[in-house]
Protein backbone atom coordinates (compact mmCIF):
# COMPACT_ATOMS: atom_id res chain seq x y z
CA UNK A 1 0.00 0.00 0.00
CA UNK A 2 2.79 2.42 0.89
CA UNK A 3 4.54 1.92 -2.48
CA UNK A 4 1.26 2.49 -4.35
CA UNK A 5 0.70 5.71 -2.41
CA UNK A 6 4.23 6.86 -3.19
CA UNK A 7 3.56 6.39 -6.90
CA UNK A 8 0.17 8.13 -6.79
CA UNK A 9 1.49 11.06 -4.76
CA UNK A 10 4.41 11.29 -7.17
CA UNK A 11 1.91 11.55 -10.03
CA UNK A 12 0.07 14.35 -8.20
CA UNK A 13 3.41 16.10 -7.75
CA UNK A 14 4.33 15.66 -11.40
CA UNK A 15 0.96 16.99 -12.59
CA UNK A 16 1.28 20.09 -10.43
CA UNK A 17 4.91 20.54 -11.48
CA UNK A 18 3.92 20.55 -15.16
CA UNK A 19 1.08 23.01 -14.50
CA UNK A 20 3.47 25.28 -12.60
CA UNK A 21 5.99 25.21 -15.44
CA UNK A 22 3.17 25.91 -17.89
CA UNK A 23 2.24 29.08 -16.01
CA UNK A 24 5.89 30.11 -15.77
CA UNK A 25 6.82 29.64 -19.42
CA UNK A 26 3.51 29.81 -21.32
CA UNK A 27 1.05 31.83 -19.24
CA UNK A 28 -1.11 32.79 -22.25
CA UNK A 29 -1.92 29.15 -23.01
CA UNK A 30 -2.52 28.37 -19.33
CA UNK A 31 -4.77 31.43 -19.00
CA UNK A 32 -7.04 29.97 -21.66
CA UNK A 33 -7.08 26.54 -20.02
CA UNK A 34 -7.84 28.02 -16.58
CA UNK A 35 -10.39 30.63 -17.80
CA UNK A 36 -8.18 33.58 -16.80
CA UNK A 37 -7.84 37.02 -18.40
CA UNK A 38 -4.56 38.66 -17.43
CA UNK A 39 -4.60 42.44 -17.86
CA UNK A 40 -1.46 43.67 -19.59
CA UNK A 41 2.12 43.12 -18.57
CA UNK A 42 1.36 43.15 -14.85
CA UNK A 43 -1.34 40.51 -15.31
CA UNK A 44 1.12 38.28 -17.14
CA UNK A 45 3.72 38.90 -14.43
CA UNK A 46 1.19 37.90 -11.79
CA UNK A 47 0.44 34.69 -13.66
CA UNK A 48 4.17 33.97 -13.96
CA UNK A 49 4.71 34.60 -10.24
CA UNK A 50 1.66 33.56 -8.23
CA UNK A 51 0.45 30.50 -10.12
CA UNK A 52 3.86 28.82 -10.40
CA UNK A 53 4.43 29.59 -6.72
CA UNK A 54 1.23 27.73 -5.84
CA UNK A 55 1.65 24.76 -8.18
CA UNK A 56 5.42 24.30 -7.90
CA UNK A 57 5.38 24.54 -4.10
CA UNK A 58 2.65 21.91 -3.91
CA UNK A 59 4.49 19.78 -6.45
CA UNK A 60 7.85 19.91 -4.73
CA UNK A 61 6.45 18.99 -1.33
CA UNK A 62 4.34 16.21 -2.88
CA UNK A 63 7.41 14.80 -4.59
CA UNK A 64 9.50 15.03 -1.40
CA UNK A 65 6.76 13.25 0.53
CA UNK A 66 6.43 10.58 -2.15
CA UNK A 67 10.19 10.01 -2.45
CA UNK A 68 10.72 9.67 1.29
CA UNK A 69 7.34 8.09 2.08
CA UNK A 70 7.14 10.88 4.65
CA UNK A 71 3.81 12.39 5.55
CA UNK A 72 5.11 15.68 6.95
CA UNK A 73 5.83 17.34 3.56
CA UNK A 74 2.32 16.38 2.39
CA UNK A 75 0.84 18.98 4.75
CA UNK A 76 1.92 21.71 2.32
CA UNK A 77 -0.02 20.49 -0.75
CA UNK A 78 -2.89 19.43 1.51
CA UNK A 79 -3.20 22.97 2.86
CA UNK A 80 -2.79 24.60 -0.57
CA UNK A 81 -5.45 22.41 -2.17
CA UNK A 82 -7.81 22.72 0.79
CA UNK A 83 -7.69 26.52 0.62
CA UNK A 84 -8.11 26.40 -3.17
CA UNK A 85 -11.20 24.22 -2.79
CA UNK A 86 -12.53 26.47 -0.02
CA UNK A 87 -12.08 29.44 -2.35
CA UNK A 88 -14.16 27.68 -4.99
CA UNK A 89 -16.98 27.13 -2.49
CA UNK A 90 -16.84 30.80 -1.48
CA UNK A 91 -16.97 31.74 -5.16
CA UNK A 92 -20.05 29.58 -5.70
CA UNK A 93 -21.73 31.18 -2.68
CA UNK A 94 -20.92 34.74 -3.76
CA UNK A 95 -20.87 34.54 -7.56
CA UNK A 96 -22.90 31.46 -8.46
CA UNK A 97 -21.82 28.41 -10.41
CA UNK A 98 -21.03 28.01 -14.09
CA UNK A 99 -21.05 24.73 -16.03
CA UNK A 100 -17.25 24.70 -15.71
CA UNK A 101 -17.30 25.06 -11.91
CA UNK A 102 -17.42 21.42 -10.82
CA UNK A 103 -14.62 19.63 -12.77
CA UNK A 104 -11.70 21.47 -11.12
CA UNK A 105 -13.37 20.98 -7.73
CA UNK A 106 -13.52 17.24 -8.35
CA UNK A 107 -9.84 17.19 -9.30
CA UNK A 108 -8.85 19.19 -6.22
CA UNK A 109 -11.00 17.03 -3.94
CA UNK A 110 -9.49 13.87 -5.46
CA UNK A 111 -5.97 15.18 -4.88
CA UNK A 112 -6.88 16.11 -1.29
CA UNK A 113 -8.31 12.63 -0.74
CA UNK A 114 -5.27 10.94 -2.25
CA UNK A 115 -2.82 13.05 -0.28
CA UNK A 116 -4.85 12.42 2.87
CA UNK A 117 -4.70 8.67 2.31
CA UNK A 118 -0.97 8.90 1.72
CA UNK A 119 -0.60 10.95 4.90
CA UNK A 120 -2.22 8.11 6.84
CA UNK A 121 -0.36 5.42 4.90
CA UNK A 122 3.06 6.96 5.47
CA UNK A 123 2.55 7.00 9.23
CA UNK A 124 4.48 9.09 11.71
CA UNK A 125 8.02 8.10 10.75
CA UNK A 126 9.82 8.58 7.44
CA UNK A 127 11.48 5.51 5.93
Regions found by a protein language model. Name each.
Residues 16-19, 80-90:
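Aromatic-anchored segments of alpha-helical transmembrane domains
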Residues 67, 86-102:
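Membrane-helix boundary connector in multi-pass membrane proteins
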Residues 70-80:
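Membrane-interfacial loop-to-transmembrane alpha-helix junctions, especially the N-terminal start
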Residues 111-127:
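Membrane-water interface at the C-terminal end of transmembrane alpha helices
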Residues 27-47:
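Interfacial loop at the N-terminal end of multi-pass membrane proteins
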Residues 7-23:
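N-terminal signal-anchor transmembrane alpha helix
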Residues 102-114:
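Small-residue-rich transmembrane alpha-helices that serve as helix-helix interface/gating elements
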Residues 43-64, 79, 83:
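Core segments of alpha-helical transmembrane spans in multipass integral membrane proteins
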